[in-house]
Amino acid sequence: MAAVKLKPEPALALVDSCGWLEYVTGGTNADFFEKALLNTGNLIVPALCLYEVGKRMLITHGEAAAFEVFEMMQRSRVVQLKPADHFLAAKTSMTHKLAMADALIWQTAQSFGATLFTQDAGLKHMSGVSLQPK
């Protein structure tokens, strides 16, 4: 009997808040994030990113645009960390001197086995990060 070849599961992706904002506002690095953002079936969105992107869009583009982006983000899988992962994020923040949001978002990518797409240079030495510098 011939062996059945299974297709490998596509890798999950996570685009951080700055990446979302870069894409939806047509920034110079928007193309870097496009493939991951348009592949909604393999894209995870930390709940924290909903807040960060929503707030920035409200400030810079108003409620209608903010809500449109909020809806777009929810077409993907919105995820949250388990309590133990928050502790790991705190340790990572201390060890690597990361801001709280950066540590939580990086830990989310790690917990879900996703590649983190970012333009945040503070994450350049972290595992599982695909960086496009600003």
Each model region followed by its residue ranges:
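A generic structural signal for short hydrophobic patches within well-formed alpha-helices
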Residues: 20-21, 50, 123-124
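Short, well-structured N-terminal submotif of metal-dependent ribonuclease cores
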Residues: 1-45, 57-68
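Acidic catalytic patch
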Residues: 52, 74-95
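Short, hinge-like loop/turn segments at secondary-structure boundaries
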Residues: 60-64, 96, 132-134
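Histidine- and aromatic-rich ligand-binding microenvironments
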Residues: 15-16, 45-46, 98-99, 120-121, ...
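Acidic, PIN/NYN-like endoribonuclease modules and their adjacent C-terminal/linker elements
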Residues: 1-10, 76, 106-134
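A general structural signal for well-ordered alpha-helical segments in protein cores
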Residues: 30, 50, 66, 86-89
